[in-house]
């Protein structure tokens, strides 16, 4: 299990170890251009490619993207089917590129409602990139933060645990192998976390932008990281307890 971000004060002006993003605004991007919603999802995939490349080059260790929530199954069936097909085709065409760039791919979520073909493709993609030690790209699909916590608690019940600690829950979450996100980004103008990594975001720095996801690029990512650098991350401490180079007045 990876120690959480809240357990230690990170060093100064380095890129965040772990960035988590809610990629919001694909549908509105398409609507503004009088295009079908699916056109926004297609363009959103281009933004994913650019952000993954930028994170790799900046030295970010973990990038987690919220692609499809447990609540998204309520969307029109035509759109859901398109998103599942887009995910399948992205796995087919992008995994070799990820592998060649030493990127490890992981998929976080239930998978119970995925087709057998999609589940098999995910398994193959994870296996192919499992030995890579560069950027870890996690796609959260059919994922919800409440589901994650309940799943962890049910595992503890099945183990016969009578007293449950925070560490026990953390160890059984879907991303127990990764540090907690240092920086959370949401595009599209909404200011909520929408059932994404509820446990893990406890001490993350939150950054919201009005940019729609298809318009989010390297420059926008750099702006978010610059904002992150201006924050004073105390994790319950006082400013005076922080190393001098991490105090807000020294940033």
UniProtKB/Swiss-Prot annotation:
Substrate binds at residues 25-29, 37, 41, 69-71, 73, 75, 186, 192-194. PROSITE patterns: UPP_SYNTHASE. InterPro entries: UPP_synth-like, UPP_synth-like_CS, UPP_synth-like_sf. Mg(2+) binds at residues 24, 205. It is an enzyme of class 2 (transferase). One of its GO terms (molecular function) is magnesium ion binding. The keyword Ubl conjugation does not apply. The active site is at residues 24, 72. Its EC number is 2.5.1.-. Keywords: Magnesium, Metal-binding, Transferase. Pfam families: Prenyltransf. GO terms for cellular component: cytosol. One of its GO terms (biological process) is polyprenol biosynthetic process. Its cofactor is Mg(2+). Catalyzes the condensation of isopentenyl diphosphate (IPP) with allylic pyrophosphates generating different type of terpenoids. PANTHER family: DEHYDRODOLICHYL DIPHOSPHATE SYNTHASE 2, DEHYDRODOLICHYL DIPHOSPHATE SYNTHASE FAMILY MEMBER. Homodimer. Belongs to the UPP synthase family. This is Isoprenyl transferase. The gene is uppS.
């Amino acid at each position: 299990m990876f120690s959480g971000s809240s357990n230690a004060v990170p060093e100064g002006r380095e890129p965040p170890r772990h960035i988590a993003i809610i990629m919001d605004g694909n549908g509105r991007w398409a609507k503004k251009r009088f295009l079908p919603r699916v056109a926004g999802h297609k363009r959103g995939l281009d933004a994913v490619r650019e952000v993954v490349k930028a994170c790799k080059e900046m030295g970010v260790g973990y990038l987690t993207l919220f692609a499809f929530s447990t609540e998204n199954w309520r969307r029109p069936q035509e759109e859901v089917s398109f998103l599942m097909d887009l995910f399948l085709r992205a796995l087919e065409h992008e995994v070799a590129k990820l592998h060649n760039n030493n990127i490890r791919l992981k998929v976080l979520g239930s998978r119970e409602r995925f087709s057998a073909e999609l589940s098999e493709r995910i398994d193959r993609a994870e296996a192919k990139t499992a030995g890579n030690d560069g950027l870890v790209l996690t796609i959260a699909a059919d994922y919800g933060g409440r589901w994650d916590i309940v799943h962890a608690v049910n595992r503890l019940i099945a183990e016969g645990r009578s007293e449950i600690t925070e560490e026990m829950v953390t160890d059984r979450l879907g991303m127990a192998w990764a540090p907690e996100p240092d920086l959370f980004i949401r595009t599209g103008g909404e200011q909520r976390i929408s059932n994404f990594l509820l446990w893990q975001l406890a001490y993350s720095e939150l950054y919201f932008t009005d940019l729609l996801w298809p318009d989010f690029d390297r420059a926008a990512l750099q702006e978010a990281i610059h904002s992150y650098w201006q924050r004073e991350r105390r994790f319950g401490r006082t400013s005076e307890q922080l190393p001098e180079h991490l105090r807000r007045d020294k940033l």
